[in-house]
């Protein structure tokens, strides 16, 4: 590509923001032209993130000063409630937008307002947003002006289910249970007692049992693919004593006489970022650390009609910034692997 794509990042001081900067630094077709932060305006990116010394010469600017309207695409790596106020103006000016927050993920406005506790500022734009689960909506993402990047739990849970749901292979009326674990970085970079080392180290706990914001997002995907399944979906997230990584164990009931591994392999045969492991394998979170990968295995529980799906991602990469870059590549007709060739870190 002769002319590089001009990229802006709004809210670049959080974990997803620095992941975007890390990934885009290795992208051959983009130029990061603007990075914003109200609290760190004037601070050099390399001073704020020592890992980026010698990589970026930019300084953070306020959104009003950054010239975002001159970018080809803008990523919003902001808390919920920001993109829905600021993205409409950019879209009107011809800028394409990928929102990493939850502002445009839920199509039913009352449902979104219930779970996120605020009035939606751009309800008319929600119907125009494409849900950016890349392997499900690739064609729609390619044409999108606004992509709602999925949440980390929804990505980890949905990717192994999509091929089975598309063929209506789950048994209606039976429970579908997702037991998930996340690294602490999923809580973001803000100060929080629950994220302190003394709280999470040598500890393991469930949270959000009465209702997690990602529940309606996952149910929306399920309901859009197969009837009679979403109502029986149960989701329990856990906080694991690790920095990054996500593991989902999904228990499901399938139609008789099928080979689910074959269905998964056939669906993801040409997908570069989904790895279907051999039967009996148990994917590990460290096998995807730092990479835009989802590794999946499926096997039947012993002496049971229950199937067990295991799925792992890096919550900051395939669960956030990596999938956002993948969606950008699709939107601009680039190779999906550009900027996403990192091999997982081990140990």
Curated annotation (Swiss-Prot):
Q: Which PANTHER family match?
A: N-ACETYL-GAMMA-GLUTAMYL-PHOSPHATE REDUCTASE, CHLOROPLASTIC-RELATED, N-ACETYL-GAMMA-GLUTAMYL-PHOSPHATE REDUCTASE, CHLOROPLASTIC-RELATED-RELATED
Family matches, as Gene3D superfamilies: Dihydrodipicolinate Reductase, domain 2, NAD(P)-binding Rossmann-like Domain
The active site consists of: 152
Q: Which family does it belong to?
A: Belongs to the NAGSA dehydrogenase family. Type 1 subfamily.
InterPro entries (alphabetical): AGPR_AS, AGPR_type-1, NAD(P)-bd_dom_sf, NAGSA_dehydrogenase, Semialdehyde_DH_NAD-bd
Indicate where this protein resides in the cell. Cytoplasm
What processes in GO biological process is this protein linked to? L-arginine biosynthetic process
What name goes with this protein? N-acetyl-gamma-glutamyl-phosphate reductase
> Superkingdom, according to UniProt?
Bacteria
Q: Please classify the protein's predominant subcellular localization into one broad category.
A: cytoplasm
List the Gene Ontology MF annotations in alphabetical order: N-acetyl-gamma-glutamyl-phosphate reductase activity; NAD binding; NADP+ binding
Question: Record's Pfam families?
Answer: Semialdhyde_dh, Semialdhyde_dhC_1
Pathway(s): Amino-acid biosynthesis; L-arginine biosynthesis; N(2)-acetyl-L-ornithine from L-glutamate: step 3/4
Tell me the organism: Neisseria meningitidis serogroup A / serotype 4A (strain DSM 15465 / Z2491)
Which PROSITE patterns did the record assign? ARGC
């Amino acid at each position: 590509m002769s002319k590089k794509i001009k990229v802006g990042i709004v809210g670049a001081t959080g974990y997803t923001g620095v992941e975007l900067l890390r990934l885009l630094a290795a992208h051959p077709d983009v130029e990061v032209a603007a990075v914003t932060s109200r609290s760190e305006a004037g601070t050099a990116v390399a001073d704020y993130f020592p890992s980026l010394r010698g990589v970026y010469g930019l300084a953070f600017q306020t959104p009003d000063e950054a010239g975002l309207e001159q970018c080809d695409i803008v990523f919003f790596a902001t808390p919920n409630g920001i993109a829905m106020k600021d993205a409409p103006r950019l879209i009107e000016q011809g800028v394409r937008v990928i929102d990493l927050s939850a502002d445009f993920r839920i199509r039913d406005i009352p449902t979104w307002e219930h779970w996120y506790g605020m009035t939606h500022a751009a309800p008319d734009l929600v119907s125009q947003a494409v849900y950016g689960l890349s392997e499900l909506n690739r064609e729609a993402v390619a044409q999108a002006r606004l992509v709602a990047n999925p949440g980390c739990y929804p990505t980890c849970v949905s990717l192994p289910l999509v091929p089975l749901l598309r063929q209506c292979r789950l048994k209606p009326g039976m429970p579908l249970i997702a037991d998930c674990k996340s690294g602490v970085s999923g809580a973001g970079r803000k100060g929080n007692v629950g994220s302190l080392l003394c709280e999470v180290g040598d500890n393991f706990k469930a949270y959000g049992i009465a209702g997690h914001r990602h529940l309606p997002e996952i149910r929306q995907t399920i309901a859009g693919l197969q009837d009679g399944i979403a109502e029986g979906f149960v989701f329990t997230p856990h906080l694991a004593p690790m920095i990054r990584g996500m593991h989902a164990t999904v228990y499901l009931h399938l139609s008789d006489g099928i080979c689910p591994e074959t269905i998964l392999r056939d669906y993801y045969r040409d997908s570069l970022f989904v790895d279907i492991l051999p039967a009996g394998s148990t994917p590990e979170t460290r096998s995807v650390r730092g990479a835009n990968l989802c590794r999946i295995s499926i096997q039947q529980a012993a002496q049971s009609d229950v199937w067990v799906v295991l799925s792992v991602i890096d919550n900051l990469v395939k669960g956030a910034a990596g999938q956002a870059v993948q969606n950008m590549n699709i939107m601009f007709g680039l190779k999906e692997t550009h900027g996403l060739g990192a091999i997982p870190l081990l140990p």
